[in-house]
C-alpha cells in the first residue's frame, strides 16, 4: 500500500477538459507504474508497463518510458510538446500534460504539497478502503462480503469471495436457490458440486432453459420451480443452503448462477454456519432468524428428498428439517417476499411490510432521525408516486430511545448513467443486466431521486452493480442495511390494496437485514468446515454493565474498527451519493446509443 499520496493524474478528453467518466490515478511517493490497466479504452499500443513516474514529497517528478511507443509531454509553462522515446527519462512539472500515445490518452499531472497533500491522503485512504476491509472471524457473520471481480487487481478483492469459498468442505446435501442457472458454468466453476451426494436446484428459468438444465444436470440433482400463482412473477431469490455433518451453512447473495454475475459485476454475499441443536439440552429459545427462515422455506414446497448424514442416518430434507439447527447466534434477520394476496397475520410477514414491522421494533441512535435513505438496485419496475411513498413509509420506520419516531428522510436512487455503462468493464454489454425500459426510467417524478454509482473506495466504479441494497445512513454511520435480491418494484416488495388490509406480491425474493444488535459474546465462531469448529470466549460481565449494542459503519468510516461493537460493512458505493448533473442520463436498455463503448461497440449491437 502507498505510504503517501503526493500527486495524481487527471484523465482528460480530447478537448483537454476533465473526463469525469474515468477515475483519477493517484501517485504515491516513489515509482508509480502506469499502463493499459489505467485506461478505460482498449488500445494495444499501450503496454501494461507503459511509463513510470517517480514523485518525491518535495514536489519534483520524473517520467520514464517503459513501453515500445513514445510519449508526449506538453509543458505547462510554454506549451511546448516534447516527444519522449522508449527508455528515455525526463523531468515533469505540475500541470504538465501527458499523452500516453501521441494525440491520445491525455492526462494532467498535479503535484501536491502541504495541505493539499494531507487532503489527498485522506482521499487516498477512502479510495483504498477495500484494501483494509479485513473483518476478524468473529465479526464475519455480522457483515457481508463483495464477490471477487476478475478484472480488478488483487488488492481490490481483499476479503472478497468466489463460489469456491462458499461451497467447500464435506457437504452432504445442498440446496441452490436462484433465478438464472447456467449448468455448464456451474459445474466447471465449482467442481466440488459433482461430489455432493444430494443437490437440489430451486430456480426461476423458463420452460426452454428448464428442459436444457434437465438434460445437462447430474443424475442425482433435483430441479424445482416454485409455483407462481400471480402473472408476471418470478422466482428471484438467491440463496445457498449447505448441510454438513457438523451443521448448516446459510448463504444469501445477489448473483445469478452464471459466469458474468460471479466474475464481472459488483455483487454481495452474506453467510453464516450454524450447529445442530443439542438433543441432550433444552432446545434454545426460538429466535427471529429461525422463524424468518422456516416461514420462507415452508412456502417453497420443494419435493422432499432423503440424505444420508454421518451419525444420523437417512434424513428427510424438507423445510422442517432446518428446525434442527441452532440459530441463536444470528445477528441478522431475513426479509423475504412470496407471491400471493397476504392478509391478516400474513400481511406483516413478507415484503416491505415485513421490513416495516422489524424496523418498528428497533431502537436507533438519535442521529438517524430524518436521516437519508438509499435505494440501490439493478432493475426498475413501473412505479408511481403513491407506491413510492408507501415504500418510503416502511423504510422510515423505527424509534429512538426516547420513543421518538425516526420519521421520513430524503431518498435517493443510485442508478448507473449511460456513461457508466459505456465505460464499464463490460462496456454496453453490462446493460443487459440492468434491464429497465425507457418508459420506467424516464418518468418525470423520478428525476429528483437519481444519484451516481460512484465506487472508487471499493475499486468497483467500472464493475456495474447487480447487487441490491437499501439503507438508512448518516455520513459513514448506518442505521440498518439490507442486502437483497429485491429490485425496486411492486412485484418484489408488494403493494398494499383494499384500504391497506392486503399486500399483493408477485415474486419470490430474499434478503438479509443488518441491524444494531446486542454483543453477547466476543470471539464466538462456529464453522462447519474448520478443524476446530467452535471457539468461544465468554464475555466478562458485571452486574451493572449496560449491554452494548453493535454499531454499523462503512469501510470509509474514520474511527477505530477494532472496537468490539463496530461492524464495518463493505458498502460498495459512495455515501453520501452524488446527485445526477444535468448532463447525466439514466441507463435504459431499450434506447440506442451510437457513441462507442470501451470495446468499440454501439448499443444495441
Curated annotation (Swiss-Prot):
Keywords: DNA damage, DNA repair, Exonuclease, Hydrolase, Nuclease, Nucleus
Segments carrying motif Nuclear localization signal: 81-86
Tree of life domain: Eukaryota
Phenotype on disruption: Developmental defects, including loss of apical dominance, early flowering and dwarf phenotype, when homozygous. Hypersensitivity to camptothecin and failure of DNA damage repair resulting in progressive cell death. No visible phenotype when heterozygous.
Pfam families: Tyr-DNA_phospho (PF06087)
Region (Interaction with DNA): 379-382
One GO biological process term: DNA repair
Places the protein is found: Nucleus
GO cellular component: nucleus
GO molecular function per UniProt: 3'-tyrosyl-DNA phosphodiesterase activity; exonuclease activity
EC id: 3.1.4.-
Regulation: Inhibited by vanadate analogs.
Broad EC category: hydrolase
Tissue: Ubiquitous, with a low level in roots.
Chain residues that bind substrate: 238, 468
Active site: 236, 466
Chain positions of site Interaction with DNA: 489
Family indicated by similarity: Belongs to the tyrosyl-DNA phosphodiesterase family.
Domain commentary: The TDP domain (123-605) is sufficient to confer the full phosphodiesterase activity.
Annotated function: DNA repair enzyme that can remove a variety of covalent adducts from DNA through hydrolysis of a 3'-phosphodiester bond, giving rise to DNA with a free 3' phosphate. Catalyzes the hydrolysis of dead-end complexes between DNA and the topoisomerase I active site tyrosine residue.
Protein name: Tyrosyl-DNA phosphodiesterase 1
GN (gene name): TDP1
Amino acid at each position: 500500500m502507498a505510504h503517501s499520496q503526493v500527486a495524481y493524474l487527471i484523465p482528460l478528453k480530447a478537448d483537454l477538459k476533465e473526463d469525469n467518466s474515468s477515475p483519477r490515478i493517484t501517485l504515491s511517493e516513489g515509482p508509480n507504474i502506469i499502463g493499459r490497466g489505467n485506461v478505460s479504452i482498449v488500445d494495444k499500443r499501450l503496454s501494461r508497463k507503459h511509463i513510470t513516474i517517480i514523485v518525491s514529497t518535495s514536489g519534483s517528478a520524473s517520467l520514464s518510458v517503459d513501453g515500445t511507443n513514445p510519449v508526449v509531454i506538453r509543458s505547462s509553462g510554454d506549451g511546448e510538446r516534447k516527444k519522449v522515446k522508449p527508455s528515455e527519462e525526463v523531468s515533469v512539472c505540475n500541470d504538465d500534460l501527458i499523452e500516453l500515445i501521441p494525440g491520445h490518452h491525455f492526462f494532467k499531472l498535479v503535484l501536491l504539497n502541504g495541505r493539499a497533500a494531507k487532503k489527498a491522503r485522506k482521499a487516498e485512504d477512502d479510495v483504498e478502503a477495500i484494501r483494509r476491509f479485513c473483518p476478524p472471524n468473529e465479526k464475519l457473520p455480522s457483515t457481508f462480503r463483495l464477490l471477487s471481480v476478475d478484472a480488478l487487481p488483487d488488492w481490490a478483492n481483499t476479503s472478497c469471495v468466489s463460489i469456491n469459498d462458499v461451497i467447500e468442505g464435506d457437504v452432504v446435501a445442498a440446496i441452490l436457490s436462484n433465478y438464472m442457472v447456467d449448468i455448464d458454468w456451474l459445474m466447471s466453476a465449482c467442481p466440488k458440486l459433482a461430489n455432493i451426494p444430494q443437490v437440489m436446484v430451486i430456480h426461476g428459468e423458463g420452460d426452454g432453459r428448464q428442459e436444457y438444465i434437465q438434460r445437462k444436470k447430474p443424475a442425482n440433482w433435483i430441479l424445482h420451480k416454485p409455483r407462481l400463482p400471480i402473472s408476471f412473477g418470478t422466482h428471484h431469490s438467491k440463496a445457498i443452503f449447505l448441510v454438513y455433518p457438523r451443521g448448516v451453512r446459510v448463504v444469501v447473495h445477489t448473483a445469478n448462477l452464471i459466469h458474468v454475475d460471479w466474475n464481472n459485476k459488483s455483487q454481495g454475499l452474506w453467510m453464516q454456519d450454524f450447529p445442530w441443536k443439542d438433543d441432550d439440552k433444552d432446545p434454545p429459545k426460538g429466535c427471529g432468524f429461525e422463524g424468518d427462515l422456516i416461514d420462507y422455506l415452508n412456502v417453497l414446497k420443494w419435493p422432499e428428498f432423503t440424505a444420508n448424514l454421518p451419525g444420523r442416518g437417512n434424513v428427510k430434507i424438507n423445510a422442517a428439517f432446518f428446525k434442527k439447527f441452532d440459530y441463536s447466534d444470528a445477528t441478522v434477520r431475513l426479509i423475504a417476499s412470496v407471491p400471493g394476496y397476504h392478509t391478516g397475520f400474513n400481511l406483516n410477514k413478507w415484503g416491505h411490510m415485513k421490513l416495516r414491522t422489524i424496523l418498528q421494533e428497533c431502537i436507533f441512535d438519535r442521529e438517524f432521525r430524518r436521516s437519508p435513505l438509499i435505494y440501490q438496485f439493478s432493475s426498475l419496475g413501473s412505479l408511481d408516486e403513491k407506491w413510492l411513498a408507501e415504500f418510503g413509509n416502511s423504510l422510515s420506520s423505527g424509534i429512538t430511545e426516547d420513543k421518538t419516531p425516526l420519521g421520513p428522510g430524503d431518498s435517493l436512487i443510485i442508478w448507473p448513467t449511460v456513461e457508466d455503462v459505456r465505460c464499464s468493464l463490460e462496456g454496453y454489454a453490462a446493460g443487459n443486466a440492468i434491464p429497465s425500459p425507457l418508459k420506467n426510467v424516464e418518468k418525470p417524478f423520478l428525476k429528483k431521486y437519481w444519484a451516481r454509482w460512484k465506487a472508487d473506495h471499493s475499486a468497483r466504479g467500472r464493475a456495474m452493480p447487480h447487487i441490491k441494497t437499501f439503507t438508512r445512513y448518516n455520513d459513514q454511520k448506518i442505521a440498518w442495511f439490507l442486502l437483497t435480491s429485491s429490485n425496486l418494484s411492486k412485484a418484489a416488495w408488494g403493494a398494499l390494496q383494499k384500504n391497506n388490509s392486503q399486500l399483493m406480491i408477485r415474486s419470490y425474493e430474499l434478503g438479509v437485514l443488518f441491524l444494531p444488535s446486542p454483543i453477547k459474546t466476543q470471539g464466538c465462531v462456529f464453522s462447519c468446515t474448520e478443524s476446530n469448529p467452535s471457539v468461544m470466549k465468554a464475555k466478562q460481565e458485571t452486574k451493572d454493565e449496560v449491554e452494548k449494542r453493535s454499531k454499523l459503519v462503512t469501510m470509509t468510516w474514520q474511527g477505530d474498527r477494532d472496537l468490539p461493537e463496530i461492524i464495518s460493512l463493505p458498502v460498495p458505493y459512495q455515501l453520501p451519493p452524488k446527485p445526477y448533473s444535468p448532463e447525466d442520463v439514466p441507463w435504459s436498455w431499450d434506447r440506442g446509443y451510437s457513441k462507442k463503448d470501451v470495446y468499440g461497440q454501439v448499443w444495441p449491437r
